[in-house]
UniProtKB/Swiss-Prot annotation:
Cysteine disulfide links: none
Effect recorded for residue 369 to A: No effect on its interaction with NEK7
Outcome recorded upon mutating residue 243 to A: No effect on its interaction with NEK7
Keyword annotations of the record: ANK repeat, Cell projection, Coiled coil, Cytoplasm, Hydroxylation, Phosphoprotein, Repeat, Ubl conjugation
Protein name (database record): Ankyrin repeat and SAM domain-containing protein 3
Positions of ANK repeats: 34-64, 68-97, 101-130, 134-163, 168-197, 201-220
Region Interaction with NEK7: start-end pairs: 1-421
Organism: Mus musculus
Disordered: region residues: 314-426
Gene Ontology cellular-component annotations: cilium; cytoplasm
Pfam families, A to Z: Ank_2, Ank_4, SAM_1
Swiss-Prot/TrEMBL domain comment: The SAM domain mediates homooligomerization.
Tissue specificity comment: Kidney (at protein level).
Domain SAM residues, every copy: 424-487
Length: 655
C-alpha cells in the first residue's frame, strides 16, 4: 500500500484482480487455490450466483452472523446489491437483526442512500423506528450522511421526524442544520417538524446552524419560526448576539471542535459528543480525555516527537465496514483542520500517519479519502476560524494561535481594531513541514530552491510536478496551504501583498475548477468525434442503399418498357385474329365454327395434340383462347412491375 499514488483511484483498484504470493518455490494446483466464497463475502462483493447457490442448498443459516456481528443481508444492504437483497428477502431472512452496535439492515441502507433496498426492507416488515445503541433511527443515519432522497423517502414512509436521541437531545432537524444540509432542512420544514425544539443544552436547530456558519439555513428557518426577543439572547449563559449578519454573528465563548462533513455511520452520537462537549456556560475546557474507540490501538509517541505527543494517534487496520475490525475508512482517513480555531493547533492527520509518527516510520502510506467532503469541510473551517478570530479581537483576547484574517474586514478604517498580536505562525518552510509531518520532503523543496513564500503559492499539480506523488503527503501540503491562506496573516503588513495572497488562494480554487471543466470538455469532444464517425458511417450506408435503389429502379423501368412493347404486339395479334375469325365465319356454317372439345385437351404446353386435325374455325377458336390467356398473364406482369416501381405509393391498382 505504500506505493499507491493519487493516480490509482478506488474504481480502478476495484476493477483489478487480486493475487496472492505463496512463497518461494511454492507450487499449487488450481484446485488447491480455488477457495470457495462464503455467504458473507459473496454478499458483500455482489456474487449473485454464489449467494443463490447457498440459498438453494438450504444447508446454511442465512441469518448467521460472522465474526464482526454482520449478516449477509447487512452487507448487501450496506453496499447496495439490490438483486442479492431481493434474493435473501425471498428466502425469508430476518430484516430486523441488529449488529453489535444495534444497526439494522434498514439503518445501513439508509446511511448509504440505498433507497430501493430500503423500500424492499420496509415491504418485508422492517421496523422504521428501531434504534441503535446510541438511540439513532434510520432517519438519523441518512440525515447525518446527507442523503436527500433517502430522507424524503423515509418521511413519506411515515418516519417520526421529531424523534430525539437520548444523549444530547438532538432531533434529525438539528443534525441536518448543524451539518449544513440545506435541502434536507427544507424537507423537514415542509414535513411540518417542530423547529423550536431544544436539545439538552438549550440550543435549537437554528442556533446550531448559526453556530456552524450555515446562514442560508438560518434564514430558511427564521421564515418558519417566530422571532425571539433579544433579551433571551443577551443572557450571560446564552450566546452574545444572534444577528443574521455575516459580519457580526459570533461563536460561543467556549472551545468546540470543528465539525467534519460526511460522517461515518459508526460515528453518529460520537460526533455529536465532540460538537457538544462543553455546555453553554461560556467556560472553555482546557483538557480533554481522549479514549480511542473500539477497533483502534493506541501507541505511545517517542521522545523525539514531543510536538506530536499532545494528540492521540489511532490506527485502523482492516475492514472498512465492521467496527469490530476497524472504524469506517471514510471516517478514519478524514483530516481535522490542523490550524483549528482554538488556543493551539490540533495535531491530527490521517490515522495511518499517526501510527507512522508514533513508531518513527515513514508516513508515505497515509492515504486520505472523501475528496468531496474535504472541500466543504475546509470552507466551513474558514468561516469558523474567521468568525472566531473576529470575536477574540472584539473582546481583546490576544492569546490566539493565529492572528485575524487578511480579508476585507482587516482593512484599516473598516471597523475599530484592537492591538494586533504578533505573527506566531511558521517562519520558514522547515517549520511548516514539520508541523504537518512531511519534514522528510524538505530536501526535495531545497533542490528546487523553494522557500516558504513560494511553497504557499504551489498548487496540487505543482507538487506533483516537483515529485510529491503520494496522495497522503500531497493532500496534507495542499490542505496546509489552503488553511494558511484562509487564516494566517502574511509576514508583511502591505495591503497589496495581503490582497495578492488572497487572490492566489482564489486562483488555486479556480485552477482546480478549470481543470475539471477541461476534463469535461475533453470528454465531450470525444463524444462529438464518435458521433461524427457514426454519422459518416451511416451516410455512407445510405448512399450505398440509394445507389442500389436507383439501379433496381432503372431495371424495373426497362422491364416495364419491354412489357409495354409485348402488350402492343399482343394488341396487333388480337386485331389480326379478329379479322381472321370474321372472314372464316363467312365461309363456314355455325356448326363448323364450334370447336370440338375432344381436340381442346391440352398437353403440357396448353396446345391441342393433333394440330393438323383441327379445322380452320377450331384452330381460330383455340388461338383466340390462348391470346386471351396471354393477355391476362401480361397484364399481371405489368401490374407487378408497377408495384415494384411505385414503392412509396399508398394505394396499388388491383389486378
Amino acid at each position: 500500500m505504500s506505493e499507491l499514488s493519487d493516480e490509482a483511484s478506488e474504481p480502478e483498484l476495484l476493477k483489478r484482480s487480486l493475487s496472492m504470493w505463496h512463497g518461494l518455490g511454492a507450487q499449487g494446483s488450481p484446485e488447491e487455490l480455488d477457495v470457495p466464497l462464503d455467504l458473507h463475502t459473496a454478499a458483500s462483493i455482489g456474487q449473485h450466483e454464489v449467494v443463490k447457490e447457498c440459498v438453494q442448498r438450504g444447508e446454511l443459516d442465512l441469518n448467521k452472523k460472522n465474526g464482526g456481528g454482520w449478516t449477509a443481508l447487512m452487507y448487501a444492504s450496506y453496499i447496495g446489491h439490490d438483486t442479492i437483497v431481493h434474493l435473501l428477502l425471498e428466502a425469508g431472512v430476518s430484516v430486523n437483526v441488529p449488529t453489535p452496535e444495534g444497526q439494522t439492515p434498514l439503518m445501513l441502507a439508509s446511511s448509504c442512500g440505498n433507497e430501493s433496498i430500503a423500500y424492499f426492507l420496509l415491504q418485508q416488515g422492517a421496523e422504521l423506528e428501531m434504534k441503535d445503541i446510541h438511540g439513532w433511527t434510520a432517519l438519523f443515519h441518512c440525515t447525518s450522511a446527507g442523503h436527500q432522497q433517502m430522507v424524503k423517502f423515509l418521511l413519506e414512509s411515515g418516519a417520526n421526524a421529531n424523534v430525539r436521541e437520548p444523549v444530547y437531545g438532538y432531533t434529525p432537524l438539528m443534525e441536518a442544520a448543524a451539518s449544513g444540509h440545506e435541502i434536507i432542512v427544507q424537507y423537514f420544514l415542509n414535513h411540518g417538524v417542530k423547529v423550536d425544539t431544544r436539545d439538552h443544552s438549550g440550543a435549537t436547530a437554528c442556533m446550531l446552524a448559526r453556530q456552524f456558519g450555515h446562514m442560508k439555513i438560518v434564514a430558511l428557518m427564521e421564515t418558519h419560526s417566530p422571532v425571539l426577543p433579544k433579551s433571551l439572547y443577551r443572557s450571560p449563559e446564552k450566546y452574545e448576539d444572534l444577528s443574521s449578519s455575516d459580519e457580526s454573528w459570533p461563536v460561543p465563548q467556549r472551545q468546540r471542535p470543528c465539525r467534519k462533513k460526511g460522517l461515518s455511520i459508526h460515528e453518529g452520537p460520537r460526533a455529536l459528543a465532540k460538537i457538544t462537549a462543553i455546555g453553554l456556560g461560556g467556560k472553555t475546557q482546557t483538557t480533554y480525555e481522549q479514549v480511542p474507540p473500539r477497533g483502534y490501538v493506541t501507541f505511545t509517541s517517542s521522545d523525539e516527537n514531543t510536538m506530536e505527543s499532545e494528540g492521540l494517534c489511532y490506527r485502523d487496520v482492516t475492514s472498512p465496514i465492521n467496527e469490530q475490525d476497524v472504524e469506517s475508512s471514510s471516517s478514519s482517513s478524514r483530516e481535522e483542520p490542523t490550524f483549528c480555531a482554538s488556543l493551539g493547533p490540533v495535531w491530527r492527520s490521517s490515522s495511518s500517519d499517526g501510527l507512522a509518527r508514533a513508531q518513527g516510520l515513514s508516513s508515505e502510506a497515509s492515504i486520505e479519502s472523501n475528496e468531496d467532503s474535504d472541500h466543504a469541510r475546509k470552507s466551513s473551517v474558514r468561516k469558523q476560524t474567521r468568525s472566531y478570530l473576529k470575536n477574540k479581537s472584539r473582546h481583546g483576547n490576544s492569546d490566539g494561535h493565529w492572528p485575524s484574517s487578511t480579508g476585507p474586514a482587516s482593512i484599516p478604517g473598516s471597523e475599530p481594531q484592537t492591538e494586533k498580536s504578533p505573527y506566531s505562525g511558521p517562519q520558514d518552510l522547515a517549520t511548516l513541514l514539520e508541523q504537518i509531518g512531511c519534514l522528510k520532503y524538505l530536501q526535495v523543496f531545497e533542490e528546487q530552491d523553494i522557500d516558504l513564500r513560494i511553497f504557499l503559492t504551489l498548487t496540487e499539480s505543482d507538487l506533483k510536478e516537483i515529485g510529491i506523488t503520494l496522495f497522503g503527503p500531497k493532500r496534507k501540503m495542499t490542505s496546509a496551504i489552503a488553511r494558511w491562506h484562509s487564516s494566517a496573516r502574511p509576514p508583511s503588513d502591505a495591503l497589496e501583498l495581503a490582497y495578492a495572497d488572497r487572490l492566489e488562494t482564489e486562483m488555486q480554487e479556480l485552477a482546480i475548477q478549470l481543470h475539471k471543466c477541461c476534463e469535461e470538455a475533453e470528454a465531450l469532444r470525444g463524444q462529438v468525434s464518435q458521433e461524427q464517425e457514426l454519422r459518416a458511417v451511416v451516410e455512407s450506408c445510405l448512399l450505398e442503399q440509394d445507389s442500389a435503389r436507383k439501379d433496381i429502379h432503372a431495371q424495373l423501368q426497362e422491364a416495364q418498357t419491354l412489357a409495354q412493347d409485348a402488350a402492343l404486339v399482343l394488341d396487333q395479334l388480337r386485331a389480326c385474329q379478329a379479322e381472321l375469325s370474321a372472314r372464316l365465319r363467312q365461309h363456314h356454317s355455325p356448326r363448323e365454327g364450334t370447336p370440338n372439345p375432344h381436340f381442346l385437351s391440352a398437353d403440357s404446353k396448353g396446345w391441342p395434340i393433333p394440330l393438323q386435325a383441327l379445322s380452320l374455325p377450331e384452330l381460330s377458336g383455340a388461338l383466340e383462347d390462348r391470346v386471351h390467356e396471354m393477355g391476362q398473364a401480361l397484364c399481371s406482369v405489368t401490374q407487378s412491375l408497377e408495384k415494384l416501381q411505385m414503392l412509396n405509393a399508398k394505394k396499388w391498382r388491383e389486378p
